[in-house]
Amino acid sequence: MLVKLVELHKPEGDRVHLDEIYVSSAAVTTIRTESGATMLEEARQLGINGEAKFSRITISEGGMTRTAVVVGSPSEIKTKLNKKMLLRD
């Protein structure tokens, strides 16, 4: 199942951008609290609530891994990844 998350993405030498990403719940191997002050402060300048929490997730992609900083606490992200969807006729 793919889950939509909001990623904080900062290209080399650029400002922070917010992007929607779709992640397979089976591909996420770790979730931990992100506290990188500079990037998070830039995200708040984009209008993200000052109370928002951020997590760093590790995604396994065909033998390689990558990390992404996403909006939400580790427990919120875990809940999203484990949410069951009902299929209707």
Regions found by a protein language model. Name each.
Residues 2-3, 9-89:
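Acidic, Ser/Thr- and proline-rich intrinsically disordered linker/docking segments
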